Amino acid sequence: MVRLFLTLSPAISRFNLYPGISILARNNNSLRLQKHHKLKTKTPTFSLISPSSSPNFQRTRFYSTETRISSLPYSENPNFDDNLVVLGIETSCDDTAAAVVRGNGEILSQVISSQAELLVQYGGVAPKQAEEAHSRVIDKVVQDALDKANLTEKDLSAVAVTIGPGLSLCLRVGVRKARRVAGNFSLPIVGVHHMEAHALVARLVEQELSFPFMALLISGGHNLLVLAHKLGQYTQLGTTVDDAIGEAFDKTAKWLGLDMHRSGGPAVEELALEGDAKSVKFNVPMKYHKDCNFSYAGLKTQVRLAIEAKEIDAKCPVSSATNEDRRNRADIAASFQRVAVLHLEEKCERAIDWALELEPSIKHMVISGGVASNKYVRLRLNNIVENKNLKLVCPPPSLCTDNGVMVAWTGLEHFRVGRYDPPPPATEPEDYVYDLRPRWPLGEEYAKGRSEARSMRTARIHPSLTSIIRADSLQQQTQT
């Protein structure tokens, strides 16, 4: 008997990449899964496409069947399998990335196409222009990743792709490409949460990293403190109530007239080395808020006012500034960086205490995301982590910024435990509507740290990854 998966809203069910665990219908894929999971499976039937009232609108609905995997191999530590090979595709913001990763953790290839010129031209990410840039290079990036791995699509076990959070226009490019590859070569497809990928890539580089662990995920669009209980289950201890730290770094770099080709973070970090970090008095945000949430909008305002007071002209690049002007810019950069990281330190310290109350066995804290490549950030946070008798785990800078490796690895982790979807149709109409999740929480909020984020009050938010997986698990239990 076929059971309709009803735990998600109709808006989400269009492209639900985390349904109840599915078994592929094609015999060759069934053999593949039997090999990886050492399980014998029956061949189920699927009803995938269900048209809506509009003749030009098609909606994918996923069904689970009477044939289910109730228990799959799972390990709190990374589970390595040489036979698995996954292609990961990432287009959530301004980098077009693809990578091929083997189940044993070997990175076979990694390709990234940057939009640095567009960032300079528009002073940040322009969604429509970013989408067009992704579309121009996505085919080449994916092909280059396969070529560098000396593989073809036929050698892949699955395709993983970021479906959120991120910019809808950009996400769509990656999802469309992933579905075409998966459909043309009858490959399973795994939808990946962008922030979970930032956290889990640390398990690729640090084999001792087991659940549960703490994670601070810091980037241009996100500040997240999460407790990772196990794969797919997270508690959100803190988030940003307005702007993320990466956004503050980018704006500071722009106002100081720095070179934005490498993004604002590295530019501010480099200039800060020349400055006095205590010369400009900035207030630490949310100093008296006894939670783990972040706010960088006010610090941005303080920086802008300090720049105006020094009459710094952003149109004059720092390379052309006078000695005094350059020193003023360096002092502001250093002072900003110090206070921005102090804010991280205070919230991280409290979050670790909360996490240890919930999961006393925690041994590691992961720091990942684009801002985690900042050496000053790593140094300061390492002191906090060591004082709590934990070990800091930071992926190398190339895996902190957005990349295809983290998507492929996260896809591997979920694929091993049966969280994937069957191959999509080989052809889909141009107006096909995908389920993209631009605002998609990673975990459930911890009661002590509930956020009052302005950006979240009116935005359409999908159920968190954790709640989706938990709901399906409960539904399976009630039927067994």
Curated annotation (Swiss-Prot):
- Identify the cofactor(s): a divalent metal cation
Query: What results from gene inactivation?
Result: Embryonic lethal.
Please classify the protein's predominant subcellular localization into one broad category: mitochondrion
Q: How many cofactor units bind, and how? A: Binds 1 divalent metal cation per subunit.
- What SUPFAM superfamilies does the annotation carry? Actin-like ATPase domain
The residues the record assigns to binding a divalent metal cation are H194, H198, D402
Q: How does it assemble?
A: Homodimer.
Which cysteine-cysteine pairs are annotated as disulfide bonds in the entry? none
Domain of life here? Eukaryota
For this entry, the protein name equals: Probable tRNA N6-adenosine threonylcarbamoyltransferase, mitochondrial
Question: GO molecular function: any one?
Answer: metal ion binding
Q: How does it sit in the membrane?
A: Peripheral membrane protein
A GO BP term here is: embryo development ending in seed dormancy
What residue range does the UniProt record give for the transit peptide? 1-86
Q: Which reaction does it catalyse?
A: L-threonylcarbamoyladenylate + adenosine(37) in tRNA = N(6)-L-threonylcarbamoyladenosine(37) in tRNA + AMP + H(+)
Similarity annotation: Belongs to the KAE1 / TsaD family.
Q: Per UniProt, which keywords does this protein have?
A: Acyltransferase, Membrane, Metal-binding, Mitochondrion, Mitochondrion inner membrane, Transferase, Transit peptide, tRNA processing
* Compartment annotation: Mitochondrion inner membrane
Q: Which residues bind substrate?
A: L217, I218, S219, G220, G221, D250, G265, E269, S373, N374, T401
Does Signal show up as a keyword for this record?
A: no
Role summary: Required for the formation of a threonylcarbamoyl group on adenosine at position 37 (t(6)A37) in mitochondrial tRNAs that read codons beginning with adenine. Probably involved in the transfer of the threonylcarbamoyl moiety of threonylcarbamoyl-AMP (TC-AMP) to the N6 group of A37. Involved in mitochondrial genome maintenance. May have a role in embryonic development in plants.
Ranges annotated as spanning the membrane: none
